[in-house]
């Protein structure tokens, strides 16, 4: 799988609220580092491992009662996507960047700003 395809699947999982499919995009030891939460006064989220990613999104989608509203998705290039996401009613501009994929096309590290 190429990076652009992985980004498209990431956005689809975020929009549908599918924590299992989202976690399946990550390597067993994959890292998700999200500093976009600072924009709404929350701490940076750093997750290591596919299981941690799945559990966190299961929790987030549950508390949110479904997927996070995402709009205005723009692919900046094959490794980065920009979008607006609503965190509890607050609209935030976010960039998600895949820093590295493994040999199987799974995410080794994704940074969200």
Predicted ranges, named:
Residues 27-72:
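A solvent-exposed, acidic/Ser-Thr-rich amphipathic alpha-helical stretch
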Residues 2, 52, 91:
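Soluble or luminal CAZymes and related metallo-dependent hydrolases
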Residues 1-18:
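Short, aromatic-enriched amphipathic alpha-helices that serve as compact interaction elements
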